[in-house]
Amino acid sequence: MNEFQRGGNKHRSWQQCFLYPLFFQEDLYAIAHDYHLDRSSSSEPAENCISNAFSFLTVKRSISRIRQQNESIVLFWNCDRNQWIDRNRSSSSELILEGLVVVLEISFSMRLKHSLEVMNGWKSFRSTHCLFPLMEEKFPHSNYILDIRVPYSIHPEILVRAFRRWIRDAPSLHLLRRILYECQNSSNAENLQKAILVVLRENTKFYLFLWNSYVYECESILVPLLKRSSHSRXXXXXXXXXXXXXXXXXXXXXXXXXXXXXKKIWLLKDPFIPYVRYGERSLIAXKGTHLQVKKCRYHLLNFWQCYFHLWFQPYRVCILELSKNCSSFLGFFLSVKMKSLMVRTKMVDDLLITYIITNEFDAIAPIRSIIGLLAKERFCDISGRPISKLAWTSLSDDDILDRFDRIWRNLFHYYSGSINQDGLYCIKYILLLSCAKTLACKHKTTIRVVREELGSKLFTKSFSKEREFISSFFSKTRSQRERIWHLDILRIIPLANSWQKIQNKKK
């Protein structure tokens, strides 16, 4: 990758984003083949056997055939006809498609690096770990939240229009258009005949690239808009102060000056706008009246529709009042609590007492929903009564203990900062008894016998006492109200992810 980028910096066509000659480089398809082997080695053996059918001789013949035919635009189309994006497509077409994505990713990464250098004034943290400090964030200037869900069914021409901004050669655009229309024809969605689901198959590299480039286009217009609005509000505040001073001189002239100054002020009055995104969900915290937030939502929808030339459904942008509504995000219920801080100001003759009111997030773990998902996985019934995991009775005792320990460790680490810790211990009790019942069912004995035979091994190896250790360590220096987040989480856990999908379907 680095060699291609260093070589591309010297080449003029690469600087102008002429990508079509790079599609004929055999080394790129070798990179895609190695990536596919690394990915399939950690998955099912069947995928590894299918990848052995890939032949570089087919790629070389296709390259030479297309070089001889100047009128040909579709690359490698004769390798596997009508099997580009099919569910039963061969490994050759899949790997060739991933080779095309390698070329696009190199150019996209260079464009992303350039855009980050331009937007260096915007303080952005592109990591999963920055999402958890959001739960501890205070919003003294915000009273509403815009809950935005990015649409994932779009027309292929919209993606081509987005690619046209950074790909300048017509053959590459025609090739991408042909592939995208094949994706559209292969989708079986009846109500989306003219759209393409960019997250239809998240496990393929091509759809991941489509989703990342599409989200980048969405944020490339949203983030500068928020940044520009914050600067414009700072300048407009001085104009509003000048209009207020003119109000003492002439009331009629002040009304006209205030109306002119109000046009410069943005709809929302918040000088600091928190923005966070994970997947298709985005949250924007803002300050203002309900009418101002509705106008902001209206203009945001119109701006998005004019930019992408697509119908942005209004229900995808919800307005939530922080003091009344709870929002589900990242597998948590987010409720806002108003906290007042008393400030005493001592003067010469008097003592002034004022109260500063701030809004704080309270992250609540959805205990009932987690119990329902555990019941779906056969760890308990719908009422929360633990049952044995019959599918694991053929495993060894250490494997059973390790699996239950891994489930509890992931749940505990992910929801360690939630305020309802008692509910987590209910989940621990369910998993602990389910583990004991699974071992008892395997050895055809009772739970009491299992606890007597394993003894402390059941409770130390599985479900370790790390919470008590951490709490005792921090209690010496911090208050008990402080919450502890474990930042060894690289992604949202599957239980929280599945629960979040259920919540999205309800909206």
Curated annotation (Swiss-Prot):
One of its GO terms (biological process) is tRNA processing. One of its GO terms (cellular component) is chloroplast. GO terms for molecular function: RNA binding. Its main location: plastid. Keywords: Chloroplast, mRNA processing, Plastid, RNA-binding, tRNA processing. The keyword Plastid applies. The keyword Chloroplast applies. It holds the Pfam family Intron_maturas2. It is found in: Plastid, Chloroplast. Belongs to the intron maturase 2 family. MatK subfamily. PANTHER family: MATURASE K (PTHR34811:SF1). Usually encoded in the trnK tRNA gene intron. Probably assists in splicing its own and other chloroplast group II introns. This is Maturase K. The gene is matK.
